[in-house]
Amino acid sequence: LTGKGIVIEGSGATTILNANMSSNLDIVINDAIEVQGGDRQITTTNGADITITGGNGTANEGIHGTKGEANSLTIDAGTGAVAIGALAGFGDGSDGSLLQNVAVSGGNVSLYSTSHSVSGDFEFNGPVTIGGPTSSTMTMSAANISFQSTIDSAASVLNGLILNSQGLTNISGAIGATNQLGSLTTDAGGTTQLAGGPVNTSDAQTFGDTVELGADTTLSSTNGSISFASAVDSDTTARTLNLSSGSTVSFDTAVGSSNALASLTLAATGTTFADDVTTTGIQNYSTPATLLNHVTFQGGEGQFAGGLDGNQKDLALNFTAPVTIDGSETFGNIANLSVQNNANLSGTINTTGFQNYGGAVTLVGDTTLQGTYGNFGSGLDGQTNNLQLEFSSETEIDGSTVFSNIGDLNSTGAVKLRGTISTTGFQNYGDTATLYGDTTLNTGTSGDVSFGGTVDGSHDLAIEAGTGRIDFFNALGSSTPLQSLNLASASAVQANSTLAIDATGGSGAGL
């Protein structure tokens, strides 16, 4: 039919669609529709609209197929609008069948019904508006679901969207960019591809299936949480993921394990990680993070400005650029901490096990390290900040690389020393000190040096304290005599116990 519009005035009955329907003017169907005898099309041209209300009565059967048939339906308004009314949801009717596939195209597509189901695929070509003027949640179920343009709520309400698919859910446009959705949920099983940029909701975003980023993506929830029950990956191109939540963010499985993200940025009240996170670029966590399992963060750069609760799990930080750990926001309760490369530290960093820093450490603020023992494989630059070491087991301080420019250095546990260790303030070693190489302690112009425990080791020890004091509160060389002792400068020296030196002894102030 061409040249005139088509209007079917129903009263809650069902229109049997057993042929294609087309018009260059508007098509209005005020009935339920049963698709019969094969695949059918409802089309308009010249910008004409298509409206299917589902009927005026209460005996609505929605849009469905004839029982026992596997029919598909195409609704195509071209540049015109498509409206699927509140009583016209895609379903199986009272005694019909689900349609096989449904494709809907239009300049804009309005879906007012709260439920839509097909046995095959849903495809929407054109901007989609969810729901009517009263807040509701729409559930869509299919083998595969595809939105080729934007998805928005009806204006001035916060309608939600649930997508149930065991196959592929592809979203190629922004969600909630014009009118924010209430919530967004995808079920477990299958994959959701986000390829349209931003996703904006008022309440929760819950992704039950695997998420694949096909474009740089920003997920924002004003009041709700954002949760990922399955993996999050890029497609074959590394993508950025920015998350902003007025509540919490949770990752129940790995991020970037199959295809690394370009970057990951988080802002929320808290974030939980149950598996590893891999990016090619920066990971920026301004939110408090909690580990649910042993976790490795790997990427170009890492920033943990919001602090971290290790929940007694191991933490590995493998970043090519220096990782920033800000302990002023609580960075602790970790089992073991391993930092593969360089690190910028400040605040208090607490572990119940070891802390291993494989790269160079730079203090960007006063820093306290607590745990069983610490290892600094490539030295430490204090940048005149204070360093407090509170390790229960022996910790190596190796000045043969760089261990210098520290303000005050205070170690409450046992230490092994070698090389040159330089501070602008005092150096206090509260427990035993063992020399495992020739050692020089330099405290600048006036810093004190004190040893609370014994000092042993068959190596040279030189101390340059300027006008500061040198105090030995326990024996020197009682187990293993020193090779030599050189007290190069000090205002006073106090030795409260015995001194044993194997070779020629030392010289300098106090001797």
What are these model-derived regions, one by one?
Residues 1-511:
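Extracellular lectin-like interaction modules
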